[in-house]
Structures are given as C-alpha cells and as structure tokens.
Swiss-Prot record:
Active-site residues (renumbered): D233 (proton acceptor)
Family: Belongs to the protein kinase superfamily. CMGC Ser/Thr protein kinase family. CDC2/CDKX subfamily.
Mutagenesis or variant effect for E149K: In he110; lack of postembryonic blast cell division
Lineage, uppermost ranks: Eukaryota, Metazoa, Ecdysozoa, Nematoda, Chromadorea
Protein name: Cyclin-dependent kinase 4 homolog
Amino acid sequence: MTIRHILAIRKKSLELPSDLKTFLRVLANCQHLKKNKKCRRTIFSVDFQNNQRQKPSNFHFWTVIKKFSKKILKSFIIKFGNNGTIAVVFSIFPTGATPSLTFLFQALGKGAYGNVYRVRSLHDGKDYALKQIMISSKNEGIPQSVLREITVMKHLARKAHPNIISLKSVFHQLDPVRAILKINMIMERCDWDLHTFLRNIPRGVPEQQAKHVTAQIVRALDFLHTHSIIHRDLKPQNILLNRDQTVKLADFGLSKEYSNTTAFTTLVVTLWYRSPEVLLQSYYNSTVDMWALGCIVSEIYCRQPLFVGQNEAEQLTDIFKKMGTPVGKDWPSESVIARDSFPQYRPTNLKDLSPQMSKQAIEFVQQCLRYDHSKRLSARGALSHPFLKPAVATKSRVLKQINFNK
C-alpha cells in the first residue's frame, strides 16, 4: 500500500512515511498542534491506493482511525473511489473543539456546482447530508448563490425552525493539484425530497397527509417571510420529507432578504413554479413563494406538475390556458411584454385540472394562484385557511407501505 499526501502546517510541508501504521502513529503524536492556537486548522488530504487486488478491511480501517485520531480530529471525510482508492480529509482544530469524525459513503444527488452525499458522524453515529461545492480556479470567484446560501443558512441555523433544514458545519478544502476549492456544508439529512416521494408512492396522497405536509411548508414560509427572506426557488425537489412526515425546506441558493419597499425583477424560481409576474419580468415580492406553493399543493394531489412549459413563453401560455388570460389590473403594468402578445383564454375549472383535490384544497390553491399578487394568499393568512386549520400530525399508511432503499 502506498500513500500520497499533502500536509499543510502553517505553510510548511512534511513528508510522511508510506506505512499506514506509521502514518497513524504520526497523526496520534500531533497532539501538540492543538496547543498552538495560531494553527486554527491543519488539513491532511490523504489518498490510500491499494495496489493489491484485495481491498483493505474497512472495519479494521475505521477501528484504527477512530482509536488513533478521535481526540485530535474535528472532521473526517472519506470517499471510496475506483480501483480501491480511498480519499480522506482530516481537519485538526485547537484545544477545546469537540471532536467529530465523519465519513462519506453514498452520493445522494447532483447540483449546479457540485454533489450531495450522505455522511455518517463517527462522533454521534448520526447520518448527515454533505453538500460539496466544487469551484475551479478558472471561475471568477465563488458564485453569489453559494455565498448567499451559506449566509442565509447560518442566519437561519441560529433560529432553529423545525421545518427548515439545519446547517451543522461549513469548511473548505483546497486541491492544489487540480486547482479546485471545495466548500463543504454539513446539514441535516432527510429520507426523500417531495419530488421522489410523489413519484414512488403506490397511490395518491390522502387528504389528511396532504394537509399535514402543506401546513409544515406554510409554517416554514411564514417563518422566512417574517424574517424578510424570500425562498425564490420553492419546488418539490427542495422540500425534504422524513418517514415521520416531518417536512423541511432546503436549498437557499436563490433566497434573498427584502424589506417592505423592496421590489425585485431578477428571474428566479424553477420554470414550472414561477409566478406570472416573474415570467413577465415585472416586480415581485414574497408572494412568489405562495404561487409556487399553490402549484406544489396541486402536484401533491395529482402527482404531476400543474403548469408545464419548456421556456418562459410556453410556461405563460400554459398558465393562461388553464387560469385564463389576465385582464385589466391583473396584468402587471411594469411588464416588458404587452398584453396583446397572448390570445384571450377562458379559465378552466381547477376541479377539472385536479379532480383528486377536495373543495377546500381547490379554494386554497386558487387563492395562492391569483394573478394580482397583492390579493394572493400570504403565508400567515394560509395558516388560518379552512384547508389547513384541522391539519394535525398523523401516521400515514402510505409512508408505511413504501419500501425505499436508503
């Protein structure tokens, strides 16, 4: 077995022997690093390459690592690659830091800038989600959405709302060979996102469960809007769900703080859940989240998107065909697109579009999908709507019948 490594200690490099036991002994003798408060973080980036056909014993590996490094390591991240490669990253913090060893073992999904992995802490034995953002030196700095997400999630973590995903830790790694900066965010891990859940259940969602899920989304939105934050990218993929039916909002890369006098015109929100004022490039506010919520509630019942378009023009046309073309004051005066650019469509009964929905659910969705955003249902108002008033936490047969591979 050979070892390739990078050991950065206050801009000094140190050659480590190629023997794993000797390496761990050196690591165990690094206790003195903790006493040096100037050395805030020491990064070990180690690749263990197994040149033999038989891979090393994972159980033995974890036992040795935990024994030798538990007291001096803050974070421990590992990834199994091809051909027996094991990539490990260690971070050492000064005295007083709580040791937490984490290893990475399952990919959960991909994003615009990186991947999401399932990780397990060797400190508390719990599973978390690791969002790893890869930034090349060719890029012009760190993307604004990444900085925004970290800022918002750190802000929200201090308030700890039960329906908003909690950020546990943020740290970075530098890969000098590939000239890549990795920003790692360790967050709560949930069992599914709403998109996956709806497409894997054997039958429709019961009314009581639909109310319970919707109520939790609304509570999270009310919390965000109360703290002057618009999510701006609400969609089923960003709504996480646990087996106990706990719902948590995630992915705040497009979220933005606002005030009562702030008006935005930037195009945001995944196409199918964009409100008309956003598609028409007009001014918008926090009610864009409520439009997206109306689309999502319909999708919970029907298990398919309410409005589907391949581009902005198609999306608007589909909305107008189903909801009717807006007239008079319903058409935004600041819109860059003229009203006569679209034919006059008559509205379709929402019951015909979503026959699975109850009368109260239809009324709720209709109030979320009003063209005039000043008349649209607010998150606070939604909590007192008759559709959500009786919502209570109940165990659902649907969740019990689903066999997901975790």
